[in-house]
């Protein structure tokens, strides 16, 4: 599942070959001296696969969704007490205390298009353990290097190269199709 998700959706950060958190959808971030506030500057000009602009509102929405009671990712975010969009390309996270691994935790949290998610009735996190299938189980609208072309869970997944990927110059992509 992670291999599929991480090729279609992107997070604020990723772990590089030296196991250091680096910016993905975030260009940079700063932490206050007391370690309680993180300010992330987002990449400008990034679009979702359907052409919608990626903004700070998508980040706030995705993290609030990930903090929800039914989310399997909520434990990674327990120290966050507030998330706010400062402007279209800046997000602030306020924590209950210093959390030096927070940028590392963000590598496991993928940003969803708020508008797409609302339009497709997938705002609530699906019940994986209960076997729930939602529109987001078989469809996606991400910012990642590959576009989900088709998905039949536990049968076959096809992804094709995203020619509009923001990082295409930094990460040459020779593979045009991935089939699981």
What are these regions (language model features)?
Residues 1-33, 64, 141:
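N-terminal lobe/hinge region of extracytoplasmic solute-binding protein
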Residues 43, 65, 162-180:
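Ligand-site clamp/hinge motif
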Residues 13-17, 34, 47, 59, ...:
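Sec-exported extracytoplasmic/periplasmic mature domains
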Residues 1-3, 25-27, 52, 102-114, ...:
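A structural "hinge/loop" feature
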Residues 41, 75-125, 150-152:
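Surface-exposed binding/hinge segments that line
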Residues 35, 78, 141, 177-180:
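Short helix-initiation/N-cap motifs at beta->coil->alpha
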Residues 16-20, 109-170:
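Gly/Pro-rich hinge or "lid" segments in bacterial periplasmic/extracellular proteins
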Residues 27-72, 86, 92, 178:
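Aromatic- and charge-enriched surface segment that lines or borders ligand/interaction sites
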């Amino acid at each position: 599942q992670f291999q599929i998700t991480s090729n279609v959706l992107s997070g604020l950060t990723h772990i590089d070959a030296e196991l250091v958190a680096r910016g993905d959808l975030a260009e940079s971030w700063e932490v206050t001296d007391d370690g309680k506030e993180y300010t992330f500057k987002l990449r400008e000009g990034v679009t979702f696969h359907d052409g919608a602009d990626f903004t700070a509102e998508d980040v706030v929405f995705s993290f609030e969704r990930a903090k929800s009671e039914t989310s399997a990712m909520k434990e990674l975010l327990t120290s966050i007490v507030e998330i706010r969009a400062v402007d279209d390309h800046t997000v602030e996270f306020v924590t209950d205390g210093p959390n030096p691994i927070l940028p590392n935790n963000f590598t496991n949290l993928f940003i969803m298009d708020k508008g797409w998610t609302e339009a497709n009735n997938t705002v609530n996190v699906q019940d994986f353990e209960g076997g729930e299938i939602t529109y987001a189980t078989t469809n996606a609208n991400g910012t990642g290097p590959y576009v989900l072309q088709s998905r039949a869970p536990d049968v076959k997944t096809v992804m094709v190269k995203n020619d509009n990927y923001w990082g295409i110059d930094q990460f040459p992509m020779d593979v045009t199709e991935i089939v699981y």
